[in-house]
């Protein structure tokens, strides 16, 4: 038996996330899978992904497709892990994997592995597999190419554009020959969008008193594609500025996650005459495209044609403050917790 540090949910989030909503505790775990526990793997967690959707799952949800994290239980999210022991025919000791079953703990016993991917290419940072080569990358790829069906020369708007998904949507759109504008919440992030990720333009939404006016300034001819990560008032302003036959990929609504009374969108009627297609999606429905995604992205990473920014905090103990940083927009790029660098 060894000690196993864990981050647990103290209580359901009620309103704004507080660091006291999470707690560090220590338990023990056996380094071998118990007899009779077939089809399981024991893993050492190396990197954990800290994503906004976790905040949604930490509240009481009335959404069958999203399970709430129960108070007293360990947070579970996407992670990169090393297999230490296996009674599952598909996994062997020593293999590196990424997927959605990594506990916010040093070691996790996964009794029913699913949606776990073996890491074959180790010529890139392992942390990329909770970012550009993991769930955020696949989300950007599926949302932009499968949901938005882009055409060369179209105009694209991305919110939370400096985040784990948005920075990739913008780069994919530029690769495809689109005109891309992003919004973010600081001057540093706006500079990053324009000078590192290659967006055509960007603006700080916190400095805009009227989103509708800001969008008309950046898209005088209207918006063809909107990749929505924030929802709320920005979504309403975007609908006002969408072109006929526009497409909206609803990836997230981070502005609404902790509101006791979510904001309504009051102009949905405009979807009809503008013939706008607005579609929500979850990335797990598109994991069958992962090999195709890797074929496109891996060479471009190695050639420097796609870049990715991470915000890595060290140690499991840093996870609560890292999540709080994501909640208030303090992170720059994909927020990752390095539990162990081996």
Curated annotation (Swiss-Prot):
Provide this UniProt record's keywords sorted from A to Z: Cytoplasm, NADP, Oxidoreductase
Query: What Gene Ontology biological process does one annotation of this record name?
Result: terpenoid biosynthetic process
Pathway(s) where this gene product acts: Secondary metabolite biosynthesis; terpenoid biosynthesis
Can you provide one Gene Ontology molecular function annotated for this UniProt record? (+)-pulegone reductase (NADP+) activity
Which InterPro entries does the UniProt entry name for this protein?
ADH-like_C, ADH_N_2, GroES-like_sf, MDR_fam, NAD(P)-bd_dom_sf, PKS_ER
Q: Is this entry keyworded S-adenosyl-L-methionine?
A: no
Q: How is its activity regulated?
A: Not inhibited by (+)-menthofuran.
Supply the induction statement: Down-regulated by (+)-menthofuran.
Which domain of life, per UniProt? Eukaryota
Q: Which reaction does it catalyse?
A: (2R,5R)-isomenthone + NADP(+) = (R)-pulegone + NADPH + H(+); (1R,4S)-menthone + NADP(+) = (R)-pulegone + NADPH + H(+)
Question: What pH dependence does Swiss-Prot or TrEMBL list here?
Answer: Optimum pH is 5.0.
Of the GO CC terms on this record, one is: cytoplasm
* Subcellular localization: Cytoplasm
Q: What is its main location?
A: cytoplasm
Q: Name one Pfam family in it.
A: ADH_zinc_N
Q: What class of enzyme is it?
A: oxidoreductase
Which residues participate in NADP(+) binding? 163-166, 189, 205, 229, 251-257, 281-283, 331
Its annotated function is as follows: Monoterpene synthase that catalyzes the specific reduction of the 4,8-double bond of (+)-pulegone to produce both (-)-menthone and (+)-isomenthone in a 70:30 ratio. Unable to utilize either (-)-isopiperitenone or (+)-cis-isopulegone, or to catalyze the reverse reaction with (-)-menthone or (+)-isomenthone. Has an absolute requirement for NADPH.
Q: Which family does it belong to?
A: Belongs to the NADP-dependent oxidoreductase L4BD family.
Which protein is depicted?
Answer: (+)-pulegone reductase
Q: Which organism is it from?
A: Mentha piperita (Peppermint)
| Organism phylogeny | Eukaryota, Viridiplantae, Streptophyta, Embryophyta, Tracheophyta
């Amino acid at each position: 038996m060894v000690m196993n540090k864990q981050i647990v949910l103290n209580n359901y989030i009620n309103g704004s996330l507080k660091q006291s909503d999470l707690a560090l505790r220590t338990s023990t775990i056996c380094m071998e899978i118990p007899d009779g526990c077939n089809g399981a793997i024991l893993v050492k967690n190396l990197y954990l992904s800290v994503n906004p959707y976790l905040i949604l799952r930490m509240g009481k949800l009335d959404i069958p497709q999203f399970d709430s994290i129960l108070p007293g239980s360990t947070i579970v999210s996407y992670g990169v892990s090393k297999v230490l022991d296996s009674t599952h025919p598909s996994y062997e000791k020593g293999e590196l994997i990424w997927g959605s079953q990594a506990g916010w703990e040093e070691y996790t016993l996964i009794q029913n592995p699913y949606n776990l991917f073996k890491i074959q290419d180790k010529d890139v940072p392992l942390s990329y597999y909770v970012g550009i080569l993991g769930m955020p990358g696949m989300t950007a790829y599926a949302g932009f190419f499968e949901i938005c069906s882009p055409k060369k020369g179209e105009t694209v708007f991305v919110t939370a554009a400096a985040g784990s998904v948005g920075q990739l949507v913008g780069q994919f759109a530029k690769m495809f020959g689109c005109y891309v504008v992003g919004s973010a919440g600081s001057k540093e992030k706006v500079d990053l969008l324009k000078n590192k990720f290659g967006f055509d333009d960007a603006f700080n939404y916190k400095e805009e008193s009227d989103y509708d006016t800001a969008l008309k300034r950046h898209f005088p001819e209207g918006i063809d594609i909107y990749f929505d990560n924030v929802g709320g008032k920005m979504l309403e302003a975007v609908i006002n500025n969408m072109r006929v036959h526009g497409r909206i990929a609803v990836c997230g609504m981070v502005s609404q996650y902790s509101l006791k009374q979510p904001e309504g969108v009051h102009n949905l009627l405009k979807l009809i005459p503008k013939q706008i297609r607005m579609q929500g999606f979850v990335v797990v429905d598109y994991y069958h495209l992962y090999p195709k995604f890797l074929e496109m992205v891996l060479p471009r990473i190695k050639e420097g044609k796609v870049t990715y920014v991470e915000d890595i905090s060290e140690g499991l103990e840093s996870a609560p403050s890292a999540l709080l940083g994501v909640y208030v927009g303090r992170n720059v790029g994909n927020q990752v917790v390095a539990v162990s660098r081996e």
